[in-house]
Amino acid sequence: MPQKYSTLKNNINMLGHFLGETISDAQGSDILDLIENIRVLSRDSRSGDEKAREKLLDTLSTISNENIIPVARAFSQFLNLTNIAEQYQTISRKHIDQVASDRSLEALFERLKAQNVPAEKVISTVEKLLIELVLTAHPTEVTRRSLLHKYVEINRCLSRLEHDDLTQSESTKLKRRLMQLIALAWHTNEIRTQRPTPVDEAKWGIAVIENSLWKAVPDFCRQLNLHLEKNFGVQHSVNLAPVKFSSWIGGDRDGNPFVTAETTRQVLIMNRWKAAELFLADIQVLSEELSVVHCTEEFRAKYGDHLEPYRVVVKNLRAKLVKTVAYYGEILENKPSTINTNDILTDDQQLWEPLYDCYQSLHQCGMRIIANGILLDCLRRIRCFGLSLSHLDIRQESLRHTKALSEITRYIGLGDYSQWMEDDKQAFLIRELSSRRPLLPRNWTPSPETQEILETCRVIAQQPEGVISCYIISMARTASDVLAVHLLLKEAGVTYYLPVVPLFETLDDLNASKEVMTQLFNVGWYRGVINNKQMVMIGYSDSAKDAGMMAASWAQYRAQEQLVNLCEKMGVELTLFHGRGGTIGRGGAPAHAALLSQPPRSLKNGLRVTEQGEMIRFKLGLPAVAVNSFDLYASAILEANLLPPPEPKESWRAIMNELSDSSCNIYRSVVRGDKDFVPYFRSATPEQELSKLPLGSRPSKRNPNGGVESLRAIPWIFAWMQNRLMLPAWLGASASIRQSIEKGNKETIEEMCKNWPFFSTRIGMLEMVFSKTDTWLSEHYDLNLVKKELWYLGQSLREQLQADIKTILSLSHEDELMSDLPWIAESIALRNIYTDPLNLLQVELLRRLRENPENPNPDVEQALMITITGIAAGMRNTG
């Protein structure tokens, strides 16, 4: 490992040593010796020692039931500790000093100055900067909340140990604390015994805000200010909020029957309670600090003549926040309310105005340094989080709205709405939207499903404007899908305009998105209410599952490009909302590269993107890590707007059209066309066992009796990642490139790699995926778990994978994958030593469980779940 990563190597070794001591104390030296023997055999196996590989297989296939859990836990926990050390490395003082990122804001501002980009243009672009991250409860976060706190504490210890001026006693004390935390993690059950409820998931999301983002947002704003002042001599306005958060947790009911209107109501109250509690803590600090006596005459006239004028204002806010916390606490505990709503804070302006007045008065009285301290941080938090803590998105599938309207139209004698032609649906919806009379009959009793839809809309109607950020329609296909939701909201009593966002997910829907939006923009009623602003969500996971990575990527690019052009032509401000996952098969890519590969002008109104599952923890779980993530997002958005990527040449488009068609055909010929594929998939991966893992609150299938098409994108990806074939992330992509090269297009493809960020990012993503695949392990799953008559399919896929790797290497002109990113290659090689035993153990456990499905051994089931979470940690992504 290079010298600049010596801190990381030392930390990994130290944490591994402490884990070994913990295991020895808890389980005895014999177990530790067994674990160490497996580790050495795995290392030698990876180095090409066939005898070591055979011995490793023999050791893991004959392991006793009482030893499987500690062995699985040891390797799983080591991989978690490696992740902690790697996450800390990104914010380590020594690492930051040694590695100046050319992707940072600081580097971008220097580059803009060097390229003589006008300062006014930079400043105006920064003023419009918006990074809106949407936290989602997708069941990819396999780490329990009870462990997350311990992992954060381990990070803090690593940070303190990096100080050079520690005494021997201080260093010993910190290392002892590390050992305690690792022991606590070891003695904590890492597998949930029950699925989390949506409210449990909401608590997890709130914890991320409280423990990390609350500090990270003002820290990032301060950092942005420093760069602006240094390079352009200006300050970022306190009124602006470059970072905002929304959440799907408690609002996303697509396919999740456990998210009800009551769930949404409860989560909204929990958010308000926590926001009031967090602001109360800030205000208490301010009330102690602001003992200043001087203020402006305007301030004194507004708030009274007091010896300590700021303290009086702040203490008044403190009293209101105390009552606000108590008010929402009583609701959450189902207690009768004892507090008058006139005595609590319900609107951000009630908190903002007095604090902003304090800020301005301090500035005008020559106390800028005081104003720009904790008070400024608090103002930034009001603009970012507000009294609702985060905005909430509502999401539901289009068919649910259609069924609700069909029930209504049948009851009032108009026939079945779902059977009408699209033109008739639109005419009916526009007529009802324009009418002042209600559509819903007074004494009508809807079905429970329709009642739930209407109740959700009523919960929205009860919220102040802005608390609910938008209503997303998954599987949106037509203009009537959007108008239908507007009508349901109107009938529920929503008096303000709420953005209704179509989510285009499948290949066909992405290709039709321009036509759907054109129809909507041509509806007079619709243009009248949207105020020339439109949000459209682009689905990455379902389109990739539908058509393969390459075809989906190109469809997403073209859809965005067409929507940008359409909205510019129509005079509509477009915000594109990206529904990405953490994995390549679900649209994941390093944030900076992914954003610079977007179509030109697609980020001019900011970025809205989902942050999912374990990616929230990796990218936002620590304040300093979150600041780095914001910095990368901000620099990519600003670069995309100030130094936009090139428009693709027509020859590049022609190649991409060809690659899209051929890759989709190759992908579908396997996934849909081979009758043996589904039984092969179900036996070669732990897909069926995954459904038993109590990850998220949402069921893993839309239809419990369906095939691959009914499986959600997340378990689809997760299952293939477990057996190291990682099929969804590459199937069809490189094969289509190889076909195109054979037709004589190599020169054009190499030009695309060099000059087109969209294409080079796709190639880089494929290279990353290939570096995590393993044909030997995949074959081991087949030989032990798959019927012999299906082996041909796995063999064919592995041969294709190896050919695809050669194709990508021929484009990079390298002998090894990831040659240009040696640190990542090193990291994967290190992890393989610990992930391989988990894969081999998983095969053995699956074999044992499937041999006796009627009477599963609880220890075997528990160990299997540990291998699943451990492999997820080793791969650094799940779904």
From Swiss-Prot:
Biological process terms in GO annotation: carbon fixation; oxaloacetate metabolic process; tricarboxylic acid cycle
The UniProt record lists the keyword Cytoplasm: no
InterPro entries, sorted: PEP_COase, PEP_COase_bac/pln-type, PEP_COase_Lys_AS, PEPCASE_His_AS, Pyrv/PenolPyrv_kinase-like_dom
Named cofactor requirement(s): Mg(2+)
Catalytic activity, as annotated: oxaloacetate + phosphate = phosphoenolpyruvate + hydrogencarbonate
GO CC term (a single one): cytosol
Alphabetized UniProt keyword annotations: Carbon dioxide fixation, Lyase, Magnesium
The UniProt record lists the keyword Magnesium: yes
Pfam family of the protein (one): PEPcase
Source organism superkingdom: Bacteria
SUPFAM superfamilies: Phosphoenolpyruvate/pyruvate domain
EC number: 4.1.1.31
GO MF: magnesium ion binding; phosphoenolpyruvate carboxylase activity
Top-level enzyme category: lyase
Residues at the catalytic site: H138, K545
Entry's family note: Belongs to the PEPCase type 1 family.
Role noted for this protein: Forms oxaloacetate, a four-carbon dicarboxylic acid source for the tricarboxylic acid cycle.
Alphabetized HAMAP family for the sequence: PEPcase_type1
PANTHER family cross-referenced by the UniProt entry: PHOSPHOENOLPYRUVATE CARBOXYLASE (PTHR30523:SF6)
NCBIfam families referenced in this protein's UniProt entry, alphabetically: PRK00009.1
UniProt protein name: Phosphoenolpyruvate carboxylase
